[in-house]
């Protein structure tokens, strides 16, 4: 019985798709088609007019980008600077540092 209910629901969805495709070609489906031309006309040598939403989104994503870059640089700086061991000054000898021996006066 469950196979029949699945088959019936599949047929119902298929019928809806078929009807919506037929209505779309007739213009009854509520689909709005653009009426030719571009929506925002390009202007020669002028900046495009941005909406407040576009300005907000660009500032948000640029702030997020800089946060991510600075966060990664602060916490994983060896990824940028390299994986070189930092020299330990306690292992250097006086001779390597150019310090004369104590007995010379």
Curated annotation (Swiss-Prot):
Chief subcellular location: mitochondrion
Region of interest: Disordered: 85-105
Acidic residues: compositionally biased ranges: 93-105
GO CC field: mitochondrial inner membrane; respiratory chain complex I
A Pfam family of this chain: NADH_B2
Keyword list, A-Z: Electron transport, Membrane, Mitochondrion, Mitochondrion inner membrane, Respiratory chain, Transit peptide, Transport
Alphabetical GO biological process terms: mitochondrial respiratory chain complex I assembly
Function: Accessory subunit of the mitochondrial membrane respiratory chain NADH dehydrogenase (Complex I), that is believed not to be involved in catalysis. Complex I functions in the transfer of electrons from NADH to the respiratory chain. The immediate electron acceptor for the enzyme is believed to be ubiquinone.
Protein name (database record): NADH dehydrogenase [ubiquinone] 1 beta subcomplex subunit 2, mitochondrial
Subunit description: Complex I is composed of 45 different subunits.
Bilayer topology: Peripheral membrane protein
Subcellular location per the Swiss-Prot or TrEMBL entry: Mitochondrion inner membrane
Signal peptide: none
Family per record: Belongs to the complex I NDUFB2 subunit family.
């Amino acid at each position: 019985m469950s196979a029949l209910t699945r088959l019936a629901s599949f047929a119902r969805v298929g019928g809806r798709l078929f009807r919506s495709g037929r209505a779309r070609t007739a213009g009854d489906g509520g689909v709005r088609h653009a009426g030719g031309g571009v929506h925002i006309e390009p202007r020669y040598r002028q900046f495009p007019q941005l909406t407040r939403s576009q300005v907000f989104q660009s500032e948000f994503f640029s702030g997020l980008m800089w946060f991510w870059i600075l966060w990664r640089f602060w916490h994983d700086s060896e990824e940028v600077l390299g994986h070189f061991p930092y020299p330990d000054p306690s292992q250097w000898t006086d001779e390597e540092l150019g310090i004369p021996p104590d007995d010379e006066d």
